Amino acid sequence: MAKSKLTKAKEISKETKERVLERQRYKSISGVALTPYNTEFHHVIFRSESGVGYEFNIVAITSEEHRAFHDHQNILVNGRKRYTYIEFGILMKNHLKLHYSGWEESKCRFHKYWDEEDYKMTRME
């Protein structure tokens, strides 16, 4: 059975993962070095909120940060509290705003007539 446009839009491709890692210079947005064993890709606008899997809605974070964020816990870096759940969410959004001209939450949500081309955002270097 063919996947729906919504299901396809939520998926994160290998190419997107690589672009996200390059954008972040293989570090979590907290500054922790990422390895193949501790890296997870997070939808800033959640999949459950129709967040798309394109690079302008994805950040790479450690598996520990990912678990803590989804559990609404403090984010620890090197065993110390670094961010509250809310601060980490703001950090992720600010990271994307810094890298994508015109970044807005609404552009990261799939809509009935959503088309990736309509929501292309220019990546700033």
Model region roles, listed by residue range:
Residues 28, 49-52, 77:
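Residues in flexible loops and secondary-structure boundaries
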Residues 6-12, 55-61, 70:
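Short, exposed beta-strand "edge-strand" segments with a Pro/Gly-rich flavor and a Y/T-containing core
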Residues 45-58:
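Short linker/helix segments within small regulatory modules
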Residues 40-44:
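Histidine-centered catalytic micro-motifs used for acid/base chemistry in nuclease
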Residues 35-36, 47, 64-68:
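Short, charged/polar surface micro-motifs in flexible loops or helix N-caps
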